[in-house]
Amino acid sequence: MRATRRGVIGISIAASGALALAACSDDGGGGEVDLEKQSKGAMDGFAADSQFTATEAFTLSLLWTEWPDLPITDSWQFFTEIEKRTNVKLEVTTIPFSDAVEKRSLLISAGDAPTVIPLVYTGEEDSFVSSGALLPISDYVEHMPHFQKYVEEWDLGEMIDNLKQADGKYYMLPGLQEVSVPVFTLVIRKDVFETVGGGIPETWDEMREALVKIKAEYPDSKPLADGFEAASMLNYAAHAFGAQAGWGFGDGMMDDGSGKLEYTAASAGYKQMVEYFRGLVEDGLIDTDSLTAANDGSGGGSVSEKFANELVFAASGSSGTAIEFAQALNETVGEGNYEVLQIAPPGGPAGQVCEPRNFWNGFMLNAEITESENFLATLQFLDWIYYNPEARELLRWGVLDETYTKDASGKITLKPEFRLDAYNINPDGATDIQKDLGWSNSVFADSTESRALKESYNTPTFVEYVDSVLATRTPREPNPPAPLDEMELERASLLATPLKDTVDTNTLRFIMGERDIAEWDDYVAELEAQGLQQYVDLVNTARERFEEENS
């Protein structure tokens, strides 16, 4: 499950954080810093593709999210090897997966957060910027040569610019991805879709046609499932309808095609998406339990069990979910008697599109780092661990020639005495490099990845998935930035939260048939009564100001 959970917590935290717009009024994080006086332990001439090793040892505090089935241990090789290579000892504050968002927010708001706050997705920093709790890290990226190198090489400069807040600075650094494809999409029984469903669906209409055929052949089935309270499926489906939903709802604002922003949940595309899924529910083509069962980070509704018992034939998931489904089918259908495939998100009325090119999780820094004598050394260490290729390989695979080997072509092979259960690699190995050694951990390993590194631990079918998305889907353009100032953030928080609550409740009610779609106009009127137009005007004003100031 961990391969699945790594994706889930990131997306669900990001979705929760996007509307956490409360602002505070403390000052901080913006004063002048004399790095020459705060360079203890820093390396002279630190450059891209070099190993960082502090010239004087120091300890760095770090916030660590703990998954229920991957408890952190002090004895992990991860900690000892990082300290051995860098002269930096990590001091960990642990928060549980179950309420990571709330715990993290409380620590930051109370001024008790550790120096480094990992597992941060773009937009989550917004709620803390005006309080002065976070370092405006854009002021210091000149000291992070690896970050600068890969932003340029992977053509990510414009995306980085979109991280800017109203003051023109950004307050988090993301994980960089050489190639960006949706992490979550549909995982299907390829053999059943080909023999019964008429082939691999390229559009949601083709998906419906296939589900009807599969339902006829397997009448006890409800062939489509989510498992993540509908948030995953609506996330990757919405783009095909010209909308944003589920995990990808964000602040609810979306480019209307003219450069202005509209509230997606009141749009024609959003309504069309809701009507589509309502039709699937009405015809018994979707497992409704999987839309409502509580999600603990692994996917609710016993989807894996239903997939194994041929009650579900397509479900939301990541590359890890595909492995999980295959393992479950081995116990029921039998190995060699099925094919599981992760497919590109189906297209729809808006075209063969998918989510915008995206970052993955990165980090924020407590603004108090500016008072540390190790400030520059900390920047160098984080630049190395987050963006150095050898560091990224270390975090995924462990120690070269000890836990894995690498041939002249760059192919990585885990040594036979080691295994990686999360990706079903060497299942007979005695030592799991994740659970026993701390490599491939959820806090660091997924952040920045080259395509080669991403493919090194995934299956050949995942490589096919990446190829298919890059060849057949066009990423939607990102929404234009509209950073809010402190007063706007406070106002937006008061408006956005009740609007989002109304959207979440009624989206599911419409889909489940608990509310007639004929009441759509009434639903929009309810949003308007909650201040929808004020919210839209507020964000568009910020958008216009940002455009004028940065044109």
What name fits each language-model region?
Residues 380, 384-505, 514:
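Conserved small-residue motifs centered on glycine
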